Amino acid sequence: MSENVMTPKFRVSFPDVFRPGKADDGGKQKYGVMMLFEKGADLSALIAEANRAGVEKWGADKSKWPKNARNPFKDQGEKEYDGYVPGAVCITAKSNQRPGLVNMKNEDIIDESEFYAGCYARATVRAFAYENKSKGIAFGLQNIQKLGDGEPFSGRVKAAEDFEPVVPDGVKEAESKTAADLFT
């Protein structure tokens, strides 16, 4: 039987924790999060749990496991997103049920702006092996604890990077005043 395993600290990407996200394969929408671990993070407990799930499903002889079984441990370098580090591991964990979500004081997080792509967290997950349209090992998301803030991943540039300052027509730059300056 699968047990909850605590992840090391990770950076949050693609959080679908307040409402289920879109299913990649057109299947049922699920809650989930992509966990971006730092290079060198101790993933031994997660690896052991994934192996346990595989042994439970397919037996101890790994040569008899499905040849093209999906591996839950991915290289962040496979994705071309800001904040993804080639050679570091990422794992996606999903759930049919909304995960519990707390802050460092173990208080529920209900404000969606408090938990975002780019913040830091840890989670409890359960490994399971599956055989349906495909075969593999995955992690079920149980609960999440936010550990800190980080630079948000937004997928967009700041407005100030898109535009140059503009001086109104007919006004020299030195004459340009702010609204507050008009009354002084």
Show where each model-derived region lies.
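OB-fold ssDNA-binding interfaces and closely related basic DNA-contact patches used
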Residues: M1-C90
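Acidic, gly/ser/pro-rich intrinsically disordered tails
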Residues: M1-N4, E151-T184
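Solvent-exposed residues in well-ordered beta-strands and their adjoining turns
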Residues: L36-G40, F128, L147
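A short secondary-structure junction signal
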Residues: L46-A48, V102-M104, N132-I137, G155-R156
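Beta-strand/loop nucleic-acid-binding surfaces
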Residues: T92-I110
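Exposed beta-sheet edge/beta-hairpin loop segments within beta-rich domains
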Residues: K105-Y120, F128-A138
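OB-fold/S1-family single-stranded nucleic acid-binding modules
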Residues: E131-E151
